[in-house]
Amino acid sequence: MQDELTSEVEDKDVTVRKADLGREIRSLISYAVGCMFGRYSLDVPGLAYAGGAWDASKYKTFIPDEDNVLPICDDEYFEDDIVGRFVKFVEVIYGKETLEENLRFIADALGGKGPSRKIIRNYFINGFYADHLKVYQKRPIYWLFDSGKKNSFKCLIYMHRYQPDTIARIRTDYIHEQQSRYRTAIADLKQRINGASTSEKVKLSKQLTTLQAQADEIRVYEEKIHHLADRMIRIDLDDGVKHNYEIFKDVLAKIK
């Protein structure tokens, strides 16, 4: 990847400078997210979409996410999981043969220990949005729906592709599915605790406490999302990021 990172990127002309490899890799990740949403395309220069009529013919090499919702979870629960999509992006650009090597290169540049996909996932959960806010000077074009400190649910949408039914889609297709997973996992843990040894019970009980806290958090969050989903809110892009973000502030990450 060191030799190839000048690929198709114009946000894109990412040339790796040894002075700050981490910054360049974060720029590549930002560009990849732009491609996932269709803001950028590997097939056309500059902006591919920033509002108006959608032109699917601009996207051949890497197809944008269909519903404009990219879940950011602690595991690959959804088909359009953001880490899974990023891995696919790297594979499309640099090839399958060097995929693992390139993911390792990216993970090492981000810093941290562990498997490359885990490091990349941790960056999306904990670092990506802060970087996005810096780049866009607290006027984010990607919006982070965030349930809270327990990380029970997060997802990104692209503001310019927002539709009145976007919130309802987040609720029914993602939050409800995640709630179901928590219920299943909690029931499973309770069963395992009943038949576990004393030392194993301590470990499983800690996991159960964490899951129950996440389930409580997402239940409260679902109620907030439900309220907004029912309103089918329309936004006007001409009103600007700050005005539109404020409408959804109760369910979006705080801008710091």
Per-region residue spans from a language model:
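Terminal accessory regions of large proteins
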Residues: 4-256
